[in-house]
Amino acid sequence: MKSTSKLQEMKLKNITEIAESVGLSEDDIELYGKYKAKISLDVLKQKPRQREGKVILVTSINPTPYGEGKTTTAIGLSMAINRLGFKSIVTLREPSLGPYLGIKGGATGGGVAQVLPSTDINLHFTGDIHAVTSANNLLCAAIDNHIYHGNELNINPKAVMVKRAMDMNDRALRNIVIGLGDGQRGAVREDGFIISVASEVMAILCLSNDLEDLKERLGNILVGFSYDKKPIYAKDLKVHGAMALLLKDAIKPNLVQTSEATAAIIHGGPFANIAHGTNSIIAIKIAQKLSDYVVVEAGFGADLGAEKFVNIVSRKSGIYPSAAVMVVTTKALKYHGSMGAKENLTSENIDTLKKGFKNLEKHIENLKLLGLEAIVTLNRFPHDTPAEISEIESFCKERGVEFAVSEAYELGSEGALDLAQKVIEVASRKRKINFVYEDSDPVEEKIRKVAKTIYGAADVQFSKSALLGLELIKKLNIDHFPICMAKTQYSLSDDPKLLGRPKDFVLNVNEIRINNGAQFIVVICGDIMTMPGLSKDYAALHLDIDEDGNVVWV
């Protein structure tokens, strides 16, 4: 057995030193041991802004199943900006246990570009996801308890819209029946579980401005409908106050450190394929107060994380990126160029690599459409050849796009200095963010605009269920909400096998869900699951612990 981390013997700095390095006093933080802390919300309310706080958005092309290293690149970039004499904080999402124990492994970076203590962060961290799970499941318990004790609100059990949650990949819980037994176990009805980070409670946590806003949004969660088709909200069940209480610490961002002892803020964990895919507004705003450059990682490709950052996060918070880093790997380009072949992706193949440029080209175009200038960044692997790197650089130069190579995995900040310098240069230019759609557009029109503009779809096909959802949105008078597209991360389309830059395809909208508390509409496209399953050879089979408490990979 060997250690999973090159940094397990590194001596971490006390988190109070990290806090001090960005202008936070001991009164501004709440300690969770020596190396983790919560940041007080008073920092956002009372502390004067010390820095300019330009936001750098890190995104990618459509990834392979193993990811392309956005987190590693984001951490390396932030460390490199600090090395150049500026103040930078990287803000990331908290890893979910499901993917950590499933296919993807940890989400704390890699090599010598990590956030630490990585094992704690990847496992239970400060308990935020547990709190989200508890708040969600309190609401679910309250619904069934209300029905059991007389059902004063006349809730139709078949019209309940909130599902239970857990932070684990477990396909057996996607669809279940509850209340079975002798009649003393509540109403028998169909239910199901979603992974906690896909819950509306998680989205609300990341989009709230403060505790008061959090409580109000929780109260506005659309629980379901009565038998006479009246909407029922969480506030009608009078549990939104207790839900907010469960989240009173979870709403505070978490301060940790990078492998070069620079500050990192980790908070919230919404997936980008089934949610909006960015850490919390509170975390980013606090980081803006304390640094010159805030490096923000947006989940999956620019068709998901970056699109939603602009159309949901920027629209709601006024946080606008000054530059965008587009992470690519030779492996991902060849994956798209070979239309999904997983063999020989680490061998030089210039023709296949160049075929994959079509996917990169569309993502560069999308960032321009959103008003962002891209710095295409190759996350370099040992198998990358000079010829492959030269081809990518030439492709970018021909299109007037900045290009950099990041070797942060192997070299830390030293391997990302060129990237950092180019990011600072691009961020100095004034940009105007463009929204893909207007608030006033009908939801159907918003969907068509994203599908055609960002994905390149020829048309959109709505199922009967989706059409009913559109009608319900009009009845509830929430057409002004932004949309959160839920689709595969592997393709620009809703078909994970349709790689490269597909054209003339029809985007299939199968379902419309209303996240009334989070204030966005979830648009389910294709076969997308809100509760993942485990693969045959999942990561947990290879994880172990040694006698000193260190994680080992079997």
Curated annotation (Swiss-Prot):
One Gene Ontology biological process: tetrahydrofolate interconversion
Binding site for ATP: 64-71
InterPro entries: Formate_THF_ligase, P-loop_NTPase
Record's catalysed reaction(s): (6S)-5,6,7,8-tetrahydrofolate + formate + ATP = (6R)-10-formyltetrahydrofolate + ADP + phosphate
Keyword Ion transport set for record: no
Pathway assignment: One-carbon metabolism; tetrahydrofolate interconversion
Domain of life of the native organism: Bacteria
Enzyme Commission (EC) number: 6.3.4.3
GO molecular function list: ATP binding; formate-tetrahydrofolate ligase activity
Gene3D superfamilies, per the entry: Domain 2, N(10)-formyltetrahydrofolate synthetase, Formyltetrahydrofolate synthetase, domain 3, P-loop containing nucleotide triphosphate hydrolases
Entry keywords, A to Z: ATP-binding, Ligase, Nucleotide-binding, One-carbon metabolism
NCBIfam families: PRK13505.1
Stated family: Belongs to the formate--tetrahydrofolate ligase family.
Protein name: Formate--tetrahydrofolate ligase
Record organism: Caldicellulosiruptor saccharolyticus (strain ATCC 43494 / DSM 8903 / Tp8T 6331)
